[in-house]
From Swiss-Prot:
Belongs to the mycobacterial PPE family. Keywords: Cell wall, Secreted, Virulence. This is PPE family protein PPE57. Immunodominant antigen that could be used for serological diagnosis to distinguish patients with active tuberculosis from M.bovis BCG-vaccinated individuals. Candidate for development of a vaccine for the control of tuberculosis. It holds the Pfam family PPE. It is found in: Secreted, Cell wall; Cell surface. It comes from Mycobacterium tuberculosis (strain ATCC 25618 / H37Rv). Interacts with human TLR2. Plays a key role in regulating innate and adaptive immune responses through human Toll-like receptor 2 (TLR2). Interacts with TLR2, leading to the subsequent activation of the mitogen-activated protein kinase (MAPK) and nuclear factor kappa B (NF-kappa-B) signaling pathways. Induces macrophage activation by augmenting the expression of several cell surface molecules (CD40, CD80, CD86 and MHC class II) and pro-inflammatory cytokines (TNF-alpha, IL-6 and IL-12p40) within macrophages. Also participates in adaptive immunity by directing Th1-polarised immune responses.
Length: 176
C-alpha cells in the first residue's frame, strides 16, 4: 500500500466490508464436502471388495483397475478439499486479525474532528501545538494502517498460492 493513503480510507474499507463470515462458511462447506468424498470412497471400497469376492475374470479386473484409479483420485481430492478449507479458514482469521489491528474509523474521525475544532478556534496560534499533536497522531494512524494492510496483503498472497491445484477425475474406461 502506498504510504500516503489516508488512514480513514483503509479503516473504512476494512470496517465497512463484508467481513469474514462467508470465508468461514466456505471453509466449513469444504470440510463437509471432504467428509462426503471420504465416505463415498469408503463405500466404493467396500463394494469393490464384495464384488472382488463374487466376480472373477478380465472384465472384473478392468472394473477393479478403473475403480482403484478413481479411489486414488477421491482420496487425493479429499485431502485437497481439507487443505483448501484450512487455507480459507486462515484467510478468514487473517482478515479478522487485520480488522482488529487497523485503527477504528471512529478514532480517526474523532482526531480529524478535534483538529477541525481547534483550527476553527485557533486565535493567535494558541492551538497550534495541539493541532500539530493531532496531525502527528494521524500520521501514526496512517503508518499503522498501511503496515497492517501490507502484512495482510503479503500473507494472503502467500496463502492463496498454497491453494491446491485441482485435477480432473481419471478416465474410467481406457479404450483399447
Amino acid at each position: 500500500m502506498h504510504p500516503m493513503i489516508p488512514a480513514e480510507y483503509i479503516s473504512n474499507i476494512i470496517y465497512e466490508g463484508p467481513g469474514a463470515d462467508s470465508l468461514f462458511f466456505a471453509s466449513g462447506q469444504l470440510r463437509e464436502l471432504a467428509y462426503s468424498v471420504e465416505t463415498t470412497a469408503e463405500s466404493l471400497e467396500d463394494e469393490l471388495d464384495e464384488l472382488d469376492e463374487n466376480w472373477k475374470g478380465s472384465s472384473s479386473d478392468l472394473l477393479a483397475d478403473a475403480v482403484e484409479r478413481y479411489l486414488q483420485w477421491l482420496s487425493k481430492h479429499s485431502s485437497q478439499l481439507k487443505h483448501a478449507a484450512w487455507v480459507i479458514n486462515g484467510l478468514a482469521n487473517a482478515y479478522n486479525d487485520t480488522r482488529r489491528k487497523v485503527v477504528p474509523p471512529e478514532e480517526i474521525a474523532a482526531n480529524r474532528e478535534e483538529r477541525r475544532r481547534l483550527i476553527a478556534s485557533n486565535v493567535a496560534g494558541v492551538n497550534t501545538p495541539a493541532i500539530a499533536d493531532l496531525d502527528a497522531q494521524y500520521d501514526q494512524y496512517r503508518a499503522r494502517n498501511v503496515a497492517v494492510m501490507n502484512a495482510y496483503v503479503s500473507w494472503t498472497r502467500s496463502a492463496l498460492s498454497d491453494l491446491p491445484r485441482w485435477r480432473e477425475p481419471p478416465q474410467i474406461y481406457r479404450g483399447g
